[in-house]
Structures are given as C-alpha cells and as structure tokens.
Amino acid sequence: MSQEKDVRLEDVAESKAELDDKARKMLEDKDADSRMRIYEGPLGKAIIVLLCVWTAFQLYFTTIGAISAINLRAIHCIFLLLFTFLLFPTYKKEKRRRKLPPIWDWVFILGSIGSFTYLILNYTRIAQTGGRISDMEVGIALVAIVCVFEAARRASGNLAILAAVFLAYNWFGAYLPGYFGHNGFTLKRVLITQFWGTQGVLGTGIGVSATYIFLFVVFGAFLKHSGFSKFINDFSLTLVGRTSGGPAKVAVIASGLMGMINGSAIANVATTGTITIPLMKRTGYKKEFAGAVEAVASTGGQFTPPIMGAVGFVMAEFLNLSYTYVALASITPALLYYVGLLLAVHFEAKRLGLSGIAKENIPNAMVVIKEQGHLVLPLVSLIGLMFVGFTPLYAAVISIFVTIGASWLRKDTRMGPDKILGAVVEGSKSAISVGVCCVIIGIIIGTVTLTSMGLNMGYLILSIVQGDHIYLAGFLVMIMSAILGMGVPGVAAYVIVQAVAVPVLIKAGALPLIAHLFCLIYACLSNITPPVAMSAYVASGIADSDQTKTGLWAVRLGLIGFIIPFFFLDNPVLLIGVDKTATLWESLWSIFTAMIGTFALVAGLEGWIIRKAGVIERVILIAVSPLLLFPGSLTDIAGIAGIAAVCIFQWIRRK
C-alpha cells in the first residue's frame, strides 16, 4: 500500500516532550548515568567545582604535566570512586534530590580515598621489595577492592557480577579439571596482583580511562554544547530527507555520526531516538522497525572512524600502532555496516511505498553550511593534528579549545561561560560510569593474567577446532565476545573481550590488528544482540514496540555487521593498509565488490531491488552475496552474474 504524503516535522513535535520523558525512564532502568543524585545547597556547588578540578587535572597531566603512570591512575581512581559514591544512588528507587549522601557513602568515600592515597605514598617501596606486603596492607587492599565492587555495582550492575565470578575463579579454579583449572592462589597473592600491581585495578583498563576515554568524552560534550549535533541533524536532512523513507536515512546518518563521538550507543538512542523514531513511525515504518533502525545506527558509531567512540585510540595503544593505521583498517567494516543499513531502510521504504519529509521542512544545504559549517572545525583539527604527528591526547585537548574558538565564529553558536561549564560538568559526569567499568575490568584482566585464562581458552578452542580452522575459532570467539560485551559500554566491552578472546584468534592464525577489530565489532554488536540488546530495548521503549521483535529486527538490520568480520578474518585485503602484499587498487576493488555483495544480501533479505522480489530471486541474491564478500576474481564474476540475472529478470517483468 503506497503512502505518498510527505511527513511534516511539526506533526511529531508535540509528542517529543512525552517521548523525552519515556526515554529518560528507559534510561533510568538501563543506564545508571540517568539516575544520578541531584544535590541542593552547598554540596551541589562543591561537586561542580570538584568536577572542574578533575577535568583540569586530567587535561594538564595527560599532556604537559609530569606525573608517573601509577599516580595518574590512582588519582583518577580516587576521583571516580568519590563521584560514584556522591552521585550514584545505592538502589534504583532511591530519591534523587537530596542535601547530603547517606552515612554509608561517606564510609565508602573515606575507604576509597584512604586506600588509594596509601598506595600512592607507598607504591615505590612495595615495588622495590618485590611486592611483599604486610597484614595491614592486605587489609587496605581488601578495603579498596570492596569499594571498587560497590562502585561498579552502582554504575554498571552486570559487570560487577561478572567481575565477582572472575575474582572467585582465582580460588575455585583450583578445583576445576582440564583447561579451566589452575593451581590456586593465596589471598595475598591475589591482592598483590589486583591492587598492588599494574595488572589489576590500576592496570590497562584504568589507564585507558585516565587518558583516552576521559579526554574524548569531554571533547564530545564540548561538541554537543557547541551545537554540533544540530548541524549533523540538519545536514543529514539536506542529504537524504526528501528521498523515499527519508526519516530513517536521517536517523542512520545522524545517529551514526553522534554515536561515533559519544561512544555510548544507549545514551545516543535516548538522545536522537526521541526525534527520529516518531518521524519514522509517522512516515509509515512499523514501530519495531523504527526502533531497530535507531538502535543499529547508534551502535555502529562505536567502530566508525575517525573517532570510533575513543575505542580506536585504545586499540592503537594495545597494538602499539599508529592510530591512523587502526582508523584506515576500520573504514571497510563501518562502510559496509552503514551501506547495508541504508539499503535496508531504502528497500523497506520502496516496498511500503513510503515518501520523504515535506520540502518545507528540509533546510537549505548552503544555509546549513554557511551558518553551522564552522562547527566541523574541531573534527578537522583533531584529524589534522594526528595526521601531522600529534598524539591523540594532545590532539583532543587542542581540539577542545578549537571547539570553543570555532563556536565564536557566529553569534548564535558562541560558547560562553555557562555553556563551557555545562560541557565540563556533562563530560566529566559521563566519564564516571565508563571509568568505573574500566576499574572493575582490571579485576577481570588481573584474573586472566594471573591464572593464564586467556592462553588456556586459546588452547581449549584450538583443541575443539582441531587444526587451522580459523573460521570455527572465530565463531566461538564471536559468541564469547557477545556474551562478555552484553550490557557494557563499548570501550569497556572491548577491553574485556580483547583480554580473553584476542589470544585465541592470534593462535588460530589471525593478524593481531584483525583479531582486535574482530573482537571490537562483536563486543559493540552485543548492544543489539538478544537477550540483553540494551540499545534495542531502549529504542523499543521510545517506539512503544515489542522488545523482542525490536531486538530481532535489529539483528536483521545489522546482519552485515555480524557477517563481515568473518570475511576479513583471513582476508586482510578487505582492510585498507593491513595486507602489505596487496596494492591499493586490489583493496579498493575488494571493498567495491563487498559493497555489491552487501547490496545483494540486503536486497534478498528485504525482498526488493527494482520491484518486489520473488522467492527464487531472493534465494539467488542471498546465495551469491558471500561470493562477492570473499575476495577473488572468479567469485566476483559469479556473484555479479547472479545479481545481473536477477536485475534483468526484474526489468523484464516490470515491462
């Protein structure tokens, strides 16, 4: 049934306040950040001052300030735990507005500050003695671990449970057989690793939070307060708003770009979904489809260059590679993911006979560029500075100041003191929950390191696949990544997964960068993978749709994201700059044919090319799509021939 009437933005504007409230309630259930306490009186003002002090500390000591890595991480932990116990409620239904925190929170605050301050003052002495600690220092470590777990319970919930299982594995693993077993460890040995060393709570996870994550979250907040999100939305409208199913395409572009910057798929759904989902429903899309489009678009931003939600910088750090190298390799998966999603919403619009947004609601492209184009300068600055040799940390800090300067190029976008303060407060608050996740991840990584779990899992999977079966190993890692990443922010999910799953893929024969990228994508896709699928479920709340159906639609729309990692797992030519034996032309041709394969797969799933596709046509399209996703001349010819045959047959039928 055709619906040719254009959609008017004012038709959905009146419901936005109601949807904002619904999104807020969904976030309060799924996302701890939205449940933060609101203090009245002097304490509220003091917290704002402390957030500003924390931001200044991070900006200074991650760039030009001199401080040891262990002290930077420990002080970062102190700030994280302090703000967690001040701002995050003890339980979900706790009253948000208050004058003071409960007495037990002061106990946790004192325990956190005291234990980590003692570590700062005594770390060098303990390190010089080979990690020998007294009974009192065992107690101090226990206090710190308890505080970390309580903070993680409030900020991330499920991750604290997972970390508790890993921590317990240090002891009960001694009673397990085979690859899962180990010799067991004393309490003191575990605490030396988890607190007094650099493999536990003060290890890689918190190191990432104290540098890349904090700076790029704050950078994203400055971009938001400068009006960059409005520019993205307006520019997306000018690009695709008038096309068939325009609102869904606007959602894909705008949500993808914003997700790339803020790194939280769930928060991104709640922010952009209140605008895009009602528009899609008004256009004629099913409510489950509308919610799924928003969830899938927001999720992909976490592995989309140039920012990748800060995950790319973390990956570069782990691999000891240039970020440019990581970003180039990430282009193909992100490109195919969003091409597939755009094609899906286009074919669905054609199948349903949907129109675009009314012409009078589409801003003039030249006016948008003239009035808001200067807001792109911070991103240009970030990319340009890294290209000429600046570290990502320096580039991020400089780009924050560029954001302020660029906003002053036009009166209506100027960031005055209030907007700057708002960006600092919002950015630092947003960094808390992710930071706490990174602290508790240290427990997981510390356990993996101490017990050799990563190596043992690798040996186990290789014994199951029995030989050089990289794809079967990849399938098992995919499941592992999806499980470990469920309900965890993108960066944190990747840090967990890479500790356990990357060694498995490398042992199976994958290149290190490919192994990391493989795990990253599946860790991010856990946001749309049932039964958890947190992004899809938040979107379903806004769309007022069935959660299970929305989650299943999200998997279908994001299917290319689940498939493409297997095609580059043993075929690095698909990733730009990874295969040193391939020419640029070979890489570009492989990407081009992969896009055609994506077209065939989506067309087959949606049942539309030129017109509605029959069952046989759909089967042919789905069957030939893998031939084009795998690099190879013969497979390319066969795949293109299959698609051409279907297109010719459809054209003849249309006549």
Show the residue positions of the predicted features.
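Core transmembrane alpha-helical segments of multi-pass membrane transporters/permeases
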Residues: 149-155, 165-166, 170-173, 179, ...
